Swiss-Prot record:
In the hair cortex, hair keratin intermediate filaments are embedded in an interfilamentous matrix, consisting of hair keratin-associated proteins (KRTAP), which are essential for the formation of a rigid and resistant hair shaft through their extensive disulfide bond cross-linking with abundant cysteine residues of hair keratins. The matrix proteins include the high-sulfur and high-glycine-tyrosine keratins. Keywords: Keratin, Repeat. It comes from Homo sapiens (Human). Sequence repeats lie at residues 46-55, 56-65, 66-75, 76-85, 92-101. This is Keratin-associated protein 13-2. The gene is KRTAP13-2. InterPro entries: Keratin_matx, KRTAP_PMG.
Length: 175
């Protein structure tokens, strides 16, 4: 089964913990092992390899100028980033600056190499190390390490915290 969780050049959908964006665009290089497609997203079960993840969320990526991000549905959060410079572009509700970079409204720093992730609107929280391949979750290339602190069985909500390319760190809630 293939997933339908992406749309647009700089407006990319994510499904579960996996961020989707183009391999390259406007002269900027992105990790080529992250999946990108132009399909429209629907809040259904999506597949990446042999793993299934529920819930879709939109994150806006624009290397030169930030687009306006918006909350797609009540429990879910969206953010806008400049991935090359790791600058949070707004309009996130709350932001912080931690030891590993900039983050969105669902993250708090617990010191170097760790984050406490709070799934705003879902009521879950958790703490995991951000080391490469730790937490038993896959480590993608270019310094990406994925962690999923908490999953609520009552709702399809997760609070993944991960370090993408270029050493930046941010967390988001996915519902």
């Amino acid at each position: 089964m293939s997933y339908n969780c992406c749309s647009g050049n700089f407006s990319s959908r994510s499904c579960g913990d996996y961020l989707r964006y183009p391999a390259s665009s406007r002269g900027f290089s992105y990790p080529s092992n992250l999946v990108y497609s132009t399909d429209l997203c629907s809040p259904s079960t999506c597949q990446l390899g042999s793993s299934l993840y529920r819930g879709c969320q939109e994150i806006c990526w624009e290397p030169t100028s930030c687009q306006t991000s918006y909350v797609e549905s009540s429990p879910c959060q969206t953010s806008c980033y400049r991935p090359r410079t790791s600058l949070l572009c707004s309009p996130c509700k709350t932001t912080y600056s931690g030891s590993l970079g900039f983050g969105s409204s669902s993250c708090r720093s617990l010191g170097y190499g760790s984050r406490s992730c709070y799934s705003v609107g879902c009521g879950s929280s958790g703490v995991r190390s951000l080391g490469y391949g730790s937490c038993g979750f896959p480590s993608l290339g270019y310094g990406s390490g994925f962690c999923r602190p908490t999953y609520l069985a009552s709702r399809s909500c997760q609070s993944p915290c991960y370090r993408p390319a270029y050493g930046s760190t941010f967390c988001r809630s996915t519902c």
